[in-house]
Regions:
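C-terminal functional modules
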Residues: 281-366
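Low-complexity, Ser/Thr/Pro/Gly-enriched N-terminal "stalk/linker" regions
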Residues: 19-54, 64-107, 156-161, 195-232, ...
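Positively charged n-region of N-terminal signal peptides that target proteins for export
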Residues: 1-4
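Short glycine/serine- and small hydrophobic-enriched flexible loop segments
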Residues: 60-65, 119-129, 185-189, 248-252, ...
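Aromatic-rich carbohydrate-recognition surfaces in CAZymes
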Residues: 52-59, 107-128
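Bacterial N-terminal signal peptides
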Residues: 6-15
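Extended ligand-binding clefts on enzyme/binding-domain cores
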Residues: 21-23, 49-53, 92, 115, ...
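Solenoid-repeat scaffolds in large eukaryotic assemblies
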Residues: 59, 71-72, 133-140, 263-264, ...
């Protein structure tokens, strides 16, 4: 049945399958409030108006999902010119850009952020495939090779993993990792290319489950060859604003993915917290399971895919609908675009990691 939804996120209140017009008002809101005419994604937090490679990478993905080729091209052009020294084939993007001490605008930290590089490579490869654009395909392939050379390390006793960046995460036989930097869908897509990707994809369930012994993902975790998983000294065992993406990625896994059932079951305790308290926690100890605070609405959106078909889905949809999108909450808006966009049926990932966007005039909300 077709429901007419007058408010921006009123669709979220519909607990029955409903036909939703595939115009994406949340994406329009994001473009209006966060993307400059030049193609820069601006995070207004604390008045700094910074740009991160993360923001650029996510916006590229959302532009692809919405078949927005003009915005995709602007985002890519700005990313390459300002973050990659004008050449994405030769340099990984710098992760942080903003106002420098001398008042000029430019790169603030030249280190890379591998999760952003993953999403940029993925979006380029899928844009090339879906739009039949050979330039995007070639650029995505070259970027993926550079990621393999500069950001992948083979950890003794574990195997090849993605380091959070090209520098600063390895020392004295110990490596710091971020589980949320490893969307299984992306590794599945990359597995068809030459490199360590197939082995990394096979290793991922072990990495995610062992680093979250109680079913709560940590933001950061260390691997030490002779001791295994260890708490990251300067960050602790807390899972919060980074770790929320682990549940998001797992919820969006294809039903045909052989690892989906065990991963969803392992990380079910986060949804149990919603059932017990009526809200998601802001932070959780990955070792003790102790919870702190009340998570923002972006967390609710991020858990929508994982809650599919469960009573929690209705609660989460209402929380997202009641809050809507803010004009000054970049990260929460990103989580909402990912989670609510998936919940609205605007895109899916196939078992091989390929993107399945709904570019028809209407899409199916589930």
């Amino acid at each position: 049945m077709k429901n007419v939804c007058g408010a921006l996120l009123l669709w979220a209140l519909c607990s029955l399958p409903a036909q939703a017009v595939c115009h994406w008002p949340e994406w329009d809101h994001f473009r209006q409030h966060y993307i400059s005419e030049e193609g820069r994604v601006i995070d207004p937090a604390e008045g700094r108006r910074i740009t991160t490679s993360e923001g650029q990478s996510y916006a590229l993905f959302f532009a692809l999902v919405n078949d927005d080729r003009e915005t995709f091209a602007r985002l890519l052009d700005w990313t390459e010119r300002q973050l990659a020294r004008g050449d994405l084939t030769g340099f990984l993007p710098s992760w942080l850009w903003g106002r420098q001490q001398d008042g000029n605008w430019g790169v603030l930290d030249a280190n890379s952020a591998s999760d952003s590089d993953f999403w940029i490579a993925y979006s380029l490869l899928e844009a090339g495939r879906l739009w039949d654009n050979h330039s995007y395909s070639a650029l995505g392939t070259l970027l993926l090779r550079r990621i393999a050379r500069e950001e992948v390390a083979t950890l003794p006793g574990l195997g090849p993993v993605l380091q959070p960046g090209a520098k600063g995460y390895e020392g004295e036989g110990r490596w710091t990792l971020n589980p949320s930097y490893l969307p299984p869908q992306l590794l599945a897509r990359f597995a068809s290319f030459q490199g360590p990707w197939g082995e990394m994809r096979a290793l991922l369930p072990k990495l995610l489950q062992e680093s979250a012994p109680r079913g709560f993902a940590p933001d950061w975790v260390d691997w030490q060859a002779d001791k295994g998983w260890q708490v990251t000294a300067d960050k602790g065992d807390t899972g919060g604003y980074d770790a929320i993406r682990v549940y998001l990625w797992l919820g969006m896994l294809s039903e045909e993915d052989p690892a989906r059932a065990s991963l969803v079951a392992h990380f079910a305790p986060m949804l149990a917290q919603l059932t017990e308290s009526g809200h998601l926690p802001e932070r959780v100890s990955s070792l003790s399971g102790q919870v702190q605070g009340k998570g923002p609405s972006g967390f609710a959106a991020a858990l929508l895919p994982l809650s599919r078909g469960l009573p929690a889905q209705v609660t989460l949809r209402k929380q997202v609908s009641d809050h809507g999108l803010d004009a000054d909450a970049y990260y929460g808006s990103v989580l909402t675009l990912f989670g609510a966009g998936w919940d609205q049926g605007r895109y899916r990932f196939a078992a091989d990691g390929t993107l399945q966007p709904d570019w028809s005039e209407s899409c199916q909300a589930e």
